[in-house]
């Protein structure tokens, strides 16, 4: 259930990943509100996710978009279309595997992972989500994977080698 909306400011695109009705039980009865998960990106390597809660859906969406804009991170892409290397990550019970792909492969991913790649600007990637299909856990696992991803420049400086030795014949 992803709904795409292109924002005018900074050309950010946002995808609504999930909308849930949640309940707080008080002594006076049940109080209903909405929890919304949104992914925001510029389709050029910057992406963020946010959660918003409010009694009204529209207000919850505004809160989620603002939270996503504040949490944006930069992901360095290979040739502007795929990841630099394969990655595994886990968040709570959500476990994911992200693999690089050749040009023309497309986005082979399901559920919430696909929405992250679409707003990030990745065109070729293979992703698998195991153990959990909870959108929040899966998206947090993707962001954890992005945090652990290293660019060829970072790998070369860690190993004390040249970038050409690391990249090879890609």
From Swiss-Prot:
Top-level division of the source organism's lineage: Bacteria
Pfam family, one: Ribosomal_S5_C
InterPro entries per the UniProt record, alphabetical: Ribosomal_Su5_D2-typ_SF, Ribosomal_uS5, Ribosomal_uS5_bac-type, Ribosomal_uS5_C, Ribosomal_uS5_N, Ribosomal_uS5_N_CS, Ribsml_uS5_D2-typ_fold_subgr
SS bond partners: none
Keywords associated with the record: Ribonucleoprotein, Ribosomal protein, RNA-binding, rRNA-binding
Any one cellular-component term (Gene Ontology): small ribosomal subunit
Residues covered by the S5 DRBM domain: 12-75
GO biological process: translation
Keyword Ribosomal protein: yes
One Gene Ontology MF term: rRNA binding
Domains as described in the record: The N-terminal domain interacts with the head of the 30S subunit; the C-terminal domain interacts with the body and contacts protein S4. The interaction surface between S4 and S5 is involved in control of translational fidelity.
Function: With S4 and S12 plays an important role in translational accuracy.
Similarity remark: Belongs to the universal ribosomal protein uS5 family.
Alphabetized HAMAP family for the sequence: Ribosomal_uS5_B
Quaternary assembly: Part of the 30S ribosomal subunit. Contacts proteins S4 and S8.
Protein name: Small ribosomal subunit protein uS5
Upper lineage: Bacteria, Pseudomonadati, Pseudomonadota, Alphaproteobacteria, Rickettsiales
